[in-house]
Each structure stands twice: as C-alpha cells, then as structure tokens.
UniProtKB/Swiss-Prot annotation:
Belongs to the flavin monoamine oxidase family. FIG1 subfamily. It is an enzyme of class 1 (oxidoreductase). Catalyzes an oxidative deamination of predominantly hydrophobic and aromatic L-amino acids, thus producing hydrogen peroxide that may contribute to the diverse toxic effects of this enzyme. Is active on L-Ile, L-Leu, L-Met, L-Phe, L-Trp, and L-Tyr. Exhibits diverse biological activities, such as hemorrhage, hemolysis, edema, apoptosis of vascular endothelial cells or tumor cell lines, antibacterial and antiparasitic activities, as well as regulation of platelet aggregation. Its effect on platelets is controversial, since it either induces aggregation or inhibits agonist-induced aggregation. Monomer. This is in contrast with most of its orthologs, that are non-covalently linked homodimers. One of its GO terms (biological process) is killing of cells of another organism. Expressed by the venom gland. This is L-amino-acid oxidase L2. Its cofactor is FAD. Keywords: Antibiotic, Antimicrobial, Apoptosis, Cytolysis, Disulfide bond, FAD, Flavoprotein, Glycoprotein, Hemolysis, Hemostasis impairing toxin, Oxidoreductase, Secreted, Toxin. It is found in: Secreted. Transmembrane segments: none annotated. Its EC number is 1.4.3.2.
C-alpha cells in the first residue's frame, strides 16, 4: 500500500495493519 491507512483497501502483502 502507499500509506499506512487501515481505512483504505487492505493489501495483505506488505502491510502490518492487515490481519487477514
């Protein structure tokens, strides 16, 4: 993702805010 925005589309590839 571009920014650490959990409100945006979650990309479970290289993000931490993504749980599943």
């Amino acid at each position: 993702a571009d920014d650490k925005n959990p409100l945006e589309e979650c990309f479970c590839e290289d993000d931490d805010y993504c749980e599943g």
